């Protein structure tokens, strides 16, 4: 794929628009999807429960979430429940090309006559291609009679699709897209350029989409932060459900998923023995906890950085050192960022690292590490293998190994979280989509969380799938602790 005008035109086959790497990979992807379905009991249970009801009938869901095999099962669950779907990935490196092809072809189609879902995603997109694909996922064709039918739901991961709609509508209202700022990242410049180009051809596109959207469900910590910022500024134009803070998402996907996929990405990217290495992990939230646990399990000597004294104390009580980045960066063999914040590892930090030290990120965006400054620093980039780059500083001769250009290494260098843990997260996504679509009048333009009983429903499905057997409260026991026999069993403020 390139950024030529020809490449940035959707392919159309059998009436389906798409842009993927290779449709001939569909059979391979379908076999992988079928295996994942066996490991995703939550989604399969929801298909059985709601198939006859079709609660998402009429929903036109624009999705922006890593186009993996697991996401394919999510997409086909949404379709099975009545929705129409268009999809793009939320990361330039995270797409699994065989999964993207299989979703376009669909379970009953062929590469020559696809019958699936429009997907605009391939591994290794440029920034221009990435934002073009995001726009395609949000751009629905008119109905057969010519009536406009914009997207009416968003399923987001990181908030890019939501930001595209809300900022686009905001700039249309202002009558101008703001100029680039000298401090803007390369990606933000691409984002603004896309909005400028669209404003020249359609000055109401994003306003129409914004007015059509009934709600958004957001997958990640970073995207949720954006939603709260939009809401605080009065710019959130539709209701949002914070899926990330469902217990069966944050305490499972964020922790156990990262525990599995971080070392998978490091191993595939570098094949370096982790045991015995000094490893610095920045951030000890749920993602950091899972990351640290996996590294320590490999025999690494782990040090944590934290701003929050509570998280820092947790790390200390688990036996890890808690230090400042600048005090230990020169001793680390591997450095991992997991904060959801920006400028965690600066250019100065990178120059102070050991020769051939490994640097990677498992937070959502690439600005946790100052990649933009590294690119402008005069350091020499040598590609070692896909998504593994050696950066050499001419003034010292030292080099560092950067994984996935500072983006999610567990998806760029590996295949992300395993299916079972994603079944938890994606079950919450489906339930949240149903909630906003079927009960839209009950929600204002604010950020909500799913109620506790739905969180427990997701957990119960997966407990049973693993052969667990839940104890049943007696009526007297339930009354004694002030809960219903069938739950919810904990108050909303309970910390699991």
From Swiss-Prot:
Residues annotated as binding substrate: 68, 157, 219, 249, 253
Q: Where does the protein principally reside?
A: cytoplasm
As recorded in UniProt, its EC number(s) are 3.13.2.1
Keywords assigned: Cytoplasm, Hydrolase, NAD, One-carbon metabolism
Kindly list the GO CC terms recorded for this protein. Answer: cytosol
Q: Which reaction does it catalyse?
A: S-adenosyl-L-homocysteine + H2O = L-homocysteine + adenosine
Q: Is RNA-binding there in the keyword field?
A: no
Which PANTHER family does this UniProt record tie to the protein? Answer: ADENOSYLHOMOCYSTEINASE
Q: What is this protein called?
A: Adenosylhomocysteinase
Q: Which organism is it from?
A: Mycolicibacterium paratuberculosis (strain ATCC BAA-968 / K-10)
């Amino acid at each position: 794929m390139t950024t030529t005008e020809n490449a940035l035109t959707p392919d159309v086959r059998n009436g389906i628009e798409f842009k993927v790497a290779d449709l001939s990979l569909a059979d391979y992807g379908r076999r992988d999807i079928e295996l994942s379905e066996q490991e995703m009991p939550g989604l399969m249970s929801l298909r059985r429960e709601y198939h006859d009801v079709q609660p998402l009938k009429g929903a036109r869901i624009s999705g922006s979430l890593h186009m993996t095999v697991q996401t394919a099962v999510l997409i086909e669950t949404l379709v099975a429940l009545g929705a129409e779907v268009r999809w793009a990935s939320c990361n330039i490196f995270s797409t699994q090309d065989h999964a993207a092809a299989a979703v376009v072809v669909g379970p009953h189609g062929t590469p020559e006559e696809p019958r699936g879902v429009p997907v605009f995603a391939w591994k290794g997109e440029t920034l221009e291609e990435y934002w073009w694909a995001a726009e395609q996922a949000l751009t629905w064709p008119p109905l057969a009679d010519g009536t406009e039918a914009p997207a009416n739901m968003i399923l987001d991961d990181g908030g890019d699709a939501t930001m595209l709609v809300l900022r686009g509508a905001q700039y249309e209202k202002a009558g101008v897209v703001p100029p680039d700022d000298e401090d803007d990242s390369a990606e933000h410049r691409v984002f603004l350029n896309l909005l400028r180009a669209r404003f020249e051809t359609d000055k109401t596109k994003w306003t129409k989409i914004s007015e059509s959207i009934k709600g958004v469900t957001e997958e990640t910590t970073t995207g949720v932060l954006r939603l709260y910022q939009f809401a605080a500024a009065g710019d959130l134009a539709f209701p949002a459900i914070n899926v990330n803070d469902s217990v069966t998402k944050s305490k499972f996907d964020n922790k156990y998923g990262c525990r599995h996929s971080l070392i998978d990405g490091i191993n595939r990217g570098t094949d370096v023995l982790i045991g015995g290495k000094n490893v610095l992990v920045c951030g000890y939230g749920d993602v950091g906890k899972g990351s640290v646990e996996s590294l320590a399990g490999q025999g690494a000597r782990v040090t944590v950085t934290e701003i929050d004294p509570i998280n820092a104390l947790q790390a200390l009580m688990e036996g890890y050192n808690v230090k400042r980045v600048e005090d230990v960066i020169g001793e680390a063999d591997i450095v991992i960022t997991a904060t959801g914040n920006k400028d965690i590892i600066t250019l100065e930090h990178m120059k102070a690292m050991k020769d051939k030290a490994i640097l990677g990120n498992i937070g959502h965006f690439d600005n946790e590490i100052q990649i933009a400054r590294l690119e402008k620093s005069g350091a020499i980039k040598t590609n070692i293998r896909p998504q593994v780059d050696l950066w050499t500083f001419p003034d010292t001769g030292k080099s560092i190994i950067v994984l996935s250009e500072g983006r999610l290494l567990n998806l760029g260098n590996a295949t992300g979280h395993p299916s079972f843990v994603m079944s938890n997260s994606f079950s919450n996504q489906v339930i949240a989509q149903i909630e906003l679509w079927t009960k839209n009048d009950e929600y204002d333009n604010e950020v909500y969380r799913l109620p506790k009983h739905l969180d427990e429903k997701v957990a119960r499905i997966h407990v049973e799938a693993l052969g667990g057997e839940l104890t049943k409260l007696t009526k007297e026991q339930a009354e004694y602790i002030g809960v219903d026999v069938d739950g919810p069993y904990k108050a909303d403020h309970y910390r699991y």
